[in-house]
């Protein structure tokens, strides 16, 4: 199916690029700074249930999580469009890709500003 192939290709491209960017930010903090924390307490105690993301300051693991999972989300979106609306595969994937990049950029900016995800 075209949507699955296109979603897989764009998922790998966008997901890899954004994961690399967020991983570099995480890695630089591990060496020269406070790790994945930005502001707030430097502990995972009291973090968000199941994920452990900081609730007192920014956490660079949040945008990294969303960037990594673009690789799985876009092929699924493409497959759904293949089944539900094959004529809208390209437009649907463009919208999903744009939304994904926006979510990663917004959560990255939020983390760098020292604001918690929740």
Enumerate the language-model features and the residues they cover.
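Polytopic transmembrane helical bundles with strong interfacial aromatic enrichment
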Residues: 10-35
């Amino acid at each position: 199916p075209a949507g699955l192939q296109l979603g897989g290709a764009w998922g790998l491209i966008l997901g890899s690029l954004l994961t690399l960017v967020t991983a570099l930010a995480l890695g630089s903090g591990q060496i020269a700074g406070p790790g994945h924390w930005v502001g707030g307490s430097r502990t995972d105690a009291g973090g968000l249930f199941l994920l452990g993301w900081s609730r007192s300051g920014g956490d660079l693991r949040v945008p990294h999580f969303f960037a990594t999972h673009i690789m799985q989300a876009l092929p699924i979106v493409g497959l759904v469009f293949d089944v539900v609306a094959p004529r809208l595969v390209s437009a649907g994937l463009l919208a999903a890709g744009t939304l994904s990049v926006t979510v990663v950029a917004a959560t990255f900016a939020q983390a760098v500003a020292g604001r918690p995800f929740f």
